[in-house]
C-alpha cells in the first residue's frame, strides 16, 4: 500500500476504563481477548476513508495513542508522559460508565495535555470543580467515549446517560457510549460508527485543511470548557 497521510489522536483516561479494548475494537473490529495494563504508550493504526462516498474521499491513517498511567501520578511521571502529547491532532477521552470518578478525571487528563506548554485559564480547585473560564486558542477536536455500557442496569441507564450527556456538553464534544466486548457497538452503519467517522473527518480537516501545514494547539470550536454541568456533578 502506498504511503498515506496520517493524523495523531490521543486516547486518554484512567487505568482500567477499557482504552486498550476500545482501541483494538476501533482498529481491528474485533474484541480484545486478554487486555493488559498499558505501560507508557501503545500505538495502533486505524484506516479511515475521509468523506467516504464523496468526490473528496481519501484514505488516511489514524494513529491511536493509548496513553497509560494515572492522572494522579507524580509530577516526574507526568513530565515523562508529556512527550506523547506533542503534535496532537485529536483527543478521545475515555471513561467507565460504572465509575463516576473516571468521568470526573477526564477534566484533569485534558488539563494535563493543555498544560504541557502553558498554564490555561481554567484551574482545578480542591473540591474537584473547575473554573468556567475559557481556554484560549484551543482547537483540538474531542470525542468523549463511555465504556462498559453493558454493565449498567436498565433501571440506572437513564440516570447514567444524562450524566454523560452533561459531561460531553462541558467539552462541547459528541459522545459515544458502548460495550467494547460487542463488535456491533461500532459496526458500519450504526450511530456510533457515524459519530466516529464524523470525528475523524474533523481531525483530518483541522490537520490538513483548516490551517495548511500547521499544528493546531487546542480544542476545537470551544465556547467554554471545564465548568458547565460539572458544577452539579460530583463523585460520591
Curated annotation (Swiss-Prot):
An MF annotation (GO) of this entry: protein homodimerization activity
Lipid biosynthesis among keywords: no
Gene3D superfamilies per UniProt: P-loop containing nucleotide triphosphate hydrolases
Binding site for GTP: 16-21, 148-150, 179-180
GO annotation terms (biological process): B cell differentiation; natural killer cell differentiation; protein stabilization; regulation of protein lipidation; regulation of Ras protein signal transduction; T cell differentiation in thymus
Stretches the record annotates as Small GTPase-like: 1-235
One Pfam family here: Roc
Reported consequences of knocking out the gene: Embryonic lethal.
UniProt entry keywords in alphabetical sequence: GTP-binding, Nucleotide-binding
InterPro entries for this protein: P-loop_NTPase
Family: Belongs to the small GTPase superfamily. Rab family.
Binding partners and assembly: Homodimer. Interacts with GPR89; the interaction stabilizes GPR89. Interacts with RAP1GDS1.
Function: Required for KRAS signaling regulation and modulation of cell proliferation. Regulator of KRAS prenylation, and probably prenylation of other small GTPases. Required for lymphocyte development and function. Not required for myeloid cell development.
Protein name: Rab-like protein 3
Species this protein is from: Mus musculus (Mouse)
Amino acid at each position: 500500500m502506498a504511503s498515506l497521510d496520517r493524523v495523531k489522536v490521543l486516547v486518554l483516561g484512567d487505568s482500567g476504563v477499557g482504552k486498550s479494548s476500545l482501541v483494538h475494537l476501533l482498529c481491528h473490529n474485533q474484541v480484545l481477548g486478554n487486555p493488559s495494563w498499558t505501560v507508557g504508550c501503545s500505538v495502533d493504526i486505524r484506516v479511515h476513508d475521509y468523506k467516504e462516498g464523496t468526490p473528496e474521499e481519501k484514505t488516511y491513517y489514524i494513529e491511536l495513542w493509548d496513553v497509560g498511567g494515572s492522572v494522579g501520578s507524580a509530577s516526574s511521571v507526568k513530565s515523562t508522559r508529556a512527550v506523547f502529547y506533542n503534535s496532537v491532532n485529536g483527543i478521545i477521552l475515555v471513561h467507565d460508565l460504572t465509575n463516576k470518578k473516571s468521568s470526573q478525571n477526564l477534566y484533569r487528563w485534558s488539563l494535563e495535555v493543555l498544560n504541557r506548554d502553558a498554564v490555561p485559564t481554567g484551574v482545578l480547585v480542591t473540591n474537584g470543580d473547575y473554573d468556567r473560564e475559557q481556554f484560549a486558542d484551543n482547537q483540538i477536536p474531542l470525542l468523549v467515549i463511555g465504556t462498559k455500557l453493558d454493565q449498567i442496569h436498565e433501571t440506572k441507564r437513564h440516570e447514567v446517560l444524562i450524566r454523560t450527556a452533561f459531561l460531553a456538553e462541558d467539552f462541547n464534544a459528541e459522545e459515544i457510549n458502548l460495550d467494547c466486548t460487542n463488535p456491533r457497538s461500532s459496526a458500519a452503519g450504526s450511530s456510533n460508527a457515524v459519530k466516529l467517522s464524523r470525528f475523524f473527518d474533523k481531525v483530518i480537516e483541522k490537520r490538513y485543511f483548516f490551517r495548511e501545514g500547521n499544528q493546531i494547539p487546542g480544542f476545537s470550536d470551544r465556547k467554554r470548557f471545564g465548568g458547565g454541568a460539572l458544577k452539579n456533578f460530583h463523585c460520591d
